[in-house]
């Protein structure tokens, strides 16, 4: 009876998921491929990771995550471990060491989640410091994306891409322009106003100038005419924009600052994420993936005949203390701060910011201890089968949200696609993924990075911006997420200590401070 009830509930949830699936959710489900595919392909080529097993297992990760968290919680590779493995050489990782590194991180994060120490850590860490981490990581991702879209690396030559071809500069430039244009929030101000200038448009037309007669002859859209016209369907008053931003959630309590979040409110309320120009959402990530696959097949028609039906058998991990020690020291320890911060703490705070209007019972699904246990349990099962070590991440959540995902249906759909491809074609899919145009992946990665970096706009005060920028600058300058995070914490602690000392001194010698204030 229990199994029958569980099966009925599963079927009902599946029908509900299918009924509520929209093109925005479909597009959003593909928004994180700019991060996932390059690392996956690199590991398949470098350390002979099994592609079919990884697609199947990570697809199951996606399905479980969407089912459990009910938001577009992404599944990403553990980037530091992947980077160390791809670096190669004496300091690199082979496949067993890479898998043991993932087990090490999963075990540590699992202990933090089971003991709920991660919740205490989340409470102690100031949100501006976390947003500084997100700003730095987002900038790095966006820089990598632009570089991937426009430049060549490795091979016989490096530098700008050739103009034409599926890997050409034109493809990268057009993809970048299209992605930015279709994912920008809609306008929230009348053209020809100061608010419009803040949005990248033209401000009030200058009047005391010899060019005024010429400016009057310009089309209204270029700032000409006698008065700036009202744009139908796009002009939103500052008060309404603030209300929209407030309604879309923000800090841990679910509120965004009214003054700076007009763009977020307008984007989430009017289709800005994944829908450019203030209109309905355009499934830009879906279009990019379909176009990329079509270009790959047209460029190399023989790819289709290189695919082989049938899954590949998992290669079970054999426990080895030398491999565990090497993997933990080279890849696990550098990965641990990033997983703790970005895959647990930052993703929790970002989810609260994006989905703060959901009921408390729903928000408890993605509390830090639950996310930490999810990372531990998923890897604790999948790594033994030879799947790539994975975690959740703020960048992936931001990317899927940016391209239109709003529910857990997006990762469930992506998981079904990945698992189906892994079971149908196994490792033979690598020939198709290798042929996917890199400029399109770069464009996806750029938009994902920009969305993650823009989370800093949730900061409420200039003081918070200072701490966020200090953290981000330290991470970018030192090229180390953990060290930059510590710099941000030290900055917060130093300011708190200074203000505490000043307050204590003012209480101890009130007359001295009173005279100083009058002076």
From Swiss-Prot:
- Activation and inhibition: 60% inhibition by 20 uM tungstate or by lack of glucose in the medium, but no inhibition by sulfate.
Write down a Pfam family by its short name: MFS_MOT1
InterPro entries cross-referenced by the UniProt entry? MOT1/MOT2
User: According to its record, how does it sit in the membrane?
Assistant: Multi-pass membrane protein
Establish whether keyword Acetylation is in the entry: no
What Gene Ontology molecular function terms does this protein carry?
A: molybdate ion transmembrane transporter activity
Gene it is expressed from:
MOT1
Q: What is the protein name stated in its UniProt record?
A: Molybdate transporter 1
Chief site of localization = membrane
Residue stretches spanning the membrane:
98-118, 164-184, 370-390, 412-432, 436-456, 464-484, 485-505
Keyword Thylakoid recorded = no
Q: Give the UniProt subcellular location, in the record's own words.
A: Membrane
Q: Which GO terms describe its cellular component?
A: membrane
Phenotype upon knockout? Decreased nitrate reductase activity due to a reduced molybdate uptake. No effect in strain 704 due to the presence of a second molybdate transporter.
Organism encoding this protein: Chlamydomonas reinhardtii (Chlamydomonas smithii)
Summarizing the function annotation, the protein's role is: High affinity molybdate transporter. Acts through an energy-dependent process.
**What inducers act on this gene?**
Up-regulated by nitrate, but not by molybdate.
Family per similarity comment: Belongs to the SLC26A/SulP transporter (TC 2.A.53) family.
Q: Which UniProt keywords are given for this protein, alphabetically ordered?
A: Membrane, Molybdenum, Transmembrane, Transmembrane helix, Transport
């Amino acid at each position: 009876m229990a199994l029958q009830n569980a099966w009925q509930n599963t079927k009902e949830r599946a029908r509900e998921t299918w009924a509520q699936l929209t093109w925005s959710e479909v597009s959003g489900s593909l928004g994180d491929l700019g991060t996932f595919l390059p690392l996956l392909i690199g590991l398949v080529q470098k350390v002979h990771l099994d592609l079919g097993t990884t697609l199947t297992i990570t697809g199951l990760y996606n399905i479980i995550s969407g089912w459990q968290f009910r938001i577009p919680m992404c599944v990403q590779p553990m980037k530091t471990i992947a980077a160390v493995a791809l670096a190669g050489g004496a300091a690199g990782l082979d496949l067993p060491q890479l898998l043991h590194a993932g087990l090490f991180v999963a075990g540590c994060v699992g202990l933090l989640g089971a003991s709920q120490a991660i919740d205490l850590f989340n409470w102690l860490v100031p949100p501006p410091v976390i947003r500084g981490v997100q700003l730095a990581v987002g900038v790095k991702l966006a820089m990598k994306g632009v570089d991937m879209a426009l430049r060549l690396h490795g091979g016989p030559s490096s530098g700008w891409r050739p103009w034409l071809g599926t890997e050409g500069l034109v493809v990268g430039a057009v993809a970048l322009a299209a992605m930015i244009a279709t994912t920008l929030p809609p306008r929230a101000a009348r053209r020809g106003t100061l608010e419009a200038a803040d949005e990248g448009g033209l401000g009030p037309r200058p009047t005391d100038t010899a060019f005024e007669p010429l400016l009057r002859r310009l089309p209204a859209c270029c700032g000409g005419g006698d008065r700036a016209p009202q744009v139908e369907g796009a002009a939103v008053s500052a008060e309404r924009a603030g209300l929209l931003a407030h309604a879309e959630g923000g800090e841990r309590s679910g509120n965004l600052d009214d003054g700076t979040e007009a763009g977020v409110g307008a984007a989430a309320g009017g289709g800005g994420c994944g829908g450019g120009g203030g209109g309905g959402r355009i499934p830009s990530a879906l279009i990019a993936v379909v176009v990329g696959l079509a270009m790959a097949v047209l460029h190399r028609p023989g790819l289709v005949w290189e695919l082989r039906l049938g899954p590949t058998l998992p290669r079970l991990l054999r426990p080895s203390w030398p491999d565990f020690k090497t993997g933990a020291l080279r890849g696990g320890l550098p990965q641990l701060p990033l997983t703790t911060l970005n895959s647990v703490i930052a993703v929790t705070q970002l989810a609260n910011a994006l989905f703060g209007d959901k009921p408390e019972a729903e928000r408890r699904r993605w509390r830090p201890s639950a996310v930490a246990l999810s990372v531990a349990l998923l890897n604790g099962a999948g790594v033994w089968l030879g799947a790539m070590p994975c975690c959740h991440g703020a960048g992936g959540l931001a990317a899927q949200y940016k391209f239109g995902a709003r529910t857990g249906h997006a990762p469930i759909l992506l998981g079904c696609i990945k698992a189906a491809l892994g079971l149908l074609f196994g490792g033979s899919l690598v020939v198709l993924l290798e042929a996917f145009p890199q400029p399109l992946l770069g464009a996806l990665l750029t938009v994902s990075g920009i969305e993650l970096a823009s989370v800093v706009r949730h900061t409420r005060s200039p003081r918070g911006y200072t701490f966020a920028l200090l953290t981000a600058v330290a991470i970018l300058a030192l090229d180390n997420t953990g060290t930059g995070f510590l710099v941000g914490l030290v900055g917060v602690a130093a300011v708190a200590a200074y203000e505490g000392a000043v307050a204590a001194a003012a209480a101890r010698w009130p007359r001295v401070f009173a005279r100083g204030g009058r002076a």
